[in-house]
UniProtKB/Swiss-Prot annotation:
Keywords: S-adenosyl-L-methionine, Transferase. Homodimer. S-adenosyl-L-methionine binds at Y39, G64, C65, S66, D89, N90, D117, I118, N132, R199. Gene3D superfamilies: Vaccinia Virus protein VP39. The keyword Cell membrane does not apply. It holds the Pfam family Methyltransf_25. Catalyzes the conversion of S-adenosyl-L-methionine (SAM) to carboxy-S-adenosyl-L-methionine (Cx-SAM). It comes from Psychromonas ingrahamii (strain DSM 17664 / CCUG 51855 / 37). InterPro entries: CmoA (IPR005271), Methyltransf_25 (IPR041698), SAM-dependent_MTases_sf (IPR029063). Belongs to the class I-like SAM-binding methyltransferase superfamily. Cx-SAM synthase family. This is Carboxy-S-adenosyl-L-methionine synthase. Its EC number is 2.1.3.-. It catalyses: prephenate + S-adenosyl-L-methionine = carboxy-S-adenosyl-L-methionine + 3-phenylpyruvate + H2O. One of its GO terms (biological process) is tRNA wobble uridine modification.
Amino acid sequence: MSKTDNIYSKRRAQIDGFSFDEQVVQVFPDMIKRSVPGYETIINSIGTITERCAVENSNLYDLGCSLGAATLSMRRGLNKAGCQIIAVDNSQQMVERCEQYIHAYKSDTPVQVLCDDICNIHIENASVVILNFTLQFLTPEKRLNLLTNIYNGLLPGGVLVLSEKFVFEDPLNHQLLNDLHLDFKRSQGYSELEISQKRASLDNVLIADTVEQHYLRLRKAGFKHNNLWYQYFNFGSIISIK
């Protein structure tokens, strides 16, 4: 059972860079629900997208799967025979807990959970690929190669769901949407100390792009059909079709 996120509730003399360690694993469902506006809507919609876009005898990938919320949503929405889901995360603690969650729900769809760098995964015979708040934690110079690997491994008509935190070129828009996000976190019970310390921990760890930067990179990777299908303040999700 998920615990309440109070990791940054006490003042710290030194703020280390954010990592998906055992402490975060313990509170992750609570943390992401209270930190990412619209997270549950995106997760539920991944199931709907899977129902529409998965094809028989194909692979589905959840890259940066954390505790498997998107994996479980895909599996619930999957209505095609002969498919398997491959979930990948580079945090051993996340993978171990993810496997527990996956095994707790019975399904005929096999799920393989791998502890690995998502850049090492060869995407093949894929109908659906999920990058749910994952690309932003990858160093920028690695992002295009990953998207190219995904594009090459997708079947014609296959889809990539790319959910991210965004920044905005217009300073007024950026400030307003950022402030609205902070208001959201306050409404979820986070204190000013928690908000400021968490933000400091994410500096140079989470590197966000503009929507336009995402579109440009996706086009370079080969995706010609890209659409922002969901946005809530400075968080959103793009669907790209091969």
